[in-house]
Swiss-Prot record:
PROSITE patterns: G_ERA, KH_TYPE_2. This is GTPase Era. The gene is era. GTP binds at residues 15-22, 62-66, 122-125. Residues 7-173 form the Era-type G domain. Residues 204-281 form the KH type-2 domain. Disulfide bonds: none annotated. Residues 15-22 are annotated as: G1. InterPro entries: G_ERA_dom, GTP-bd, GTPase_Era-like, KH_dom-like_a/b, KH_dom_type_2, KH_sf_prok-type, P-loop_NTPase, Small_GTP-bd. The lineage of its organism: Bacteria, Pseudomonadati, Thermodesulfobacteriota, Desulfuromonadia, Geobacterales. GO terms for cellular component: cytosol; plasma membrane. Residues 122-125 are annotated as: G4. GO terms for molecular function: GTP binding; GTPase activity; ribosomal small subunit binding; small ribosomal subunit rRNA binding. Monomer.
């Protein structure tokens, strides 16, 4: 196939928190590179996932959920999400098909768009009765003239291939933007930290996960092929430290075991993971700390 017919471009994935944006990206790539949990605001950074084949390269840009920001870290997350609304070739606006249509939010996003917007109706497997889906689609059709409305289930994979095909058709012709053998331009240490943070979100409750961050302090491959990783889970309060460690260290061990399994799948090798917990009071409001962690 000639280079002139090769397609490549940037596609942003935006939407409210907890609508399934990160699950969608992981499903498209066939690999977990983004932290996922049932708690909103799990994603904090702009994350690029790269899907390449013989005909095209799609650079998906996953963003933090757009929400009302009350803390410095939340403001940084929303700023990051809105930054990628411009300068891309296509936008995928992901909404939860089971939730009420947010007219003001949809109109606001569409008015700021600098590229065509495809509406992605996620969680269609949870819509009951199934006939209700037609009513949902009609509601969004009245709001904005979307070139495409694609019902999907990121969890089950339903209609994902159709979505990717439609995205690919829209891309401009051009050369690949990244090497064709990578899934993301993020360093492995970042993804490892994300996988650990995901387990904190999944296994702890209330405000605890929102005041945590993970820093990978050491990442080294030994002669026997084993990868040794030391990581620190930062929290804002002593009480949170106690919750994450758990009685007799049970919770920290559980976080470590589940994270290690995901990291081993990611790296394709055995992993030795050692976790520490450190208190950094009000780190979510400290500009220098947020910048160091890559949130600003």
């Amino acid at each position: 196939m000639s280079d002139s017919t090769y397609k490549a471009g940037f596609v942003s994935i935006i939407g409210r928190p907890n609508v399934g944006k990160s699950t969608l990206l992981n499903r498209i790539l066939g690999e977990k590179i983004v932290a996922v949990s049932d708690k909103p605001q799990t994603t904090r950074n702009v994350i690029r996932g790269i899907l390449s084949d013989e005909t095209s390269q799609i650079v998906f840009v996953d963003t933090p959920g757009i929400h009302t920001a009350r803390t410095r870290i939340n403001r940084a997350m929303v700023d990051a999400a809105m930054t990628v609304v411009t300068g891309i070739d296509l936008m995928l606006l992901v909404v939860d098909a089971t939730q009420k249509i947010e007219e003001t939010f949809i109109k606001d996003i569409c008015s700021k768009a600098g590229a065509p917007i495809y509406l992605v109706l996620n969680k269609i497997d949870q819509v009951t009765p199934k006939e209700k889906l037609f009513t949902v689609i009609e509601g969004y059709t009245r709001l904005y003239d979307f070139p495409e409305i694609i019902p999907i289930s990121a969890q089950s994979g339903s209609n994902i291939e159709r979505l990717v095909d439609l995205v690919r058709e829209h891309l401009p012709e051009g050369e690949a933007l990244f090497p064709d053998d990578i899934l993301t331009d993020l360093p492995e240490k970042f993804i490892v930290a994300e996988l650990i943070r995901e387990k904190v979100f999944r296994l702890t409750n209330r405000e605890v996960p929102y005041g945590t961050a993970v820093v990978v302090e050491a990442f080294a491959e030994r002669e026997n092929g084993l990868v040794a990783i030391n990581a620190t889970i930062m929290v804002e309060r002593d009480s949170h430290k106690g919750i994450i460690i758990g009685k007799k260290g049970v919770m920290l061990k559980k976080i470590g075991e589940q994270a290690r399994r995901d990291i081993e799948r990611l790296l394709g090798t055995k992993v030795y993971l050692e976790l520490f917990v450190q208190v950094q009071e009000r780190w979510t409001e400290r500009t220098a700390m947020l910048r160091e962690l890559g949130y600003e």
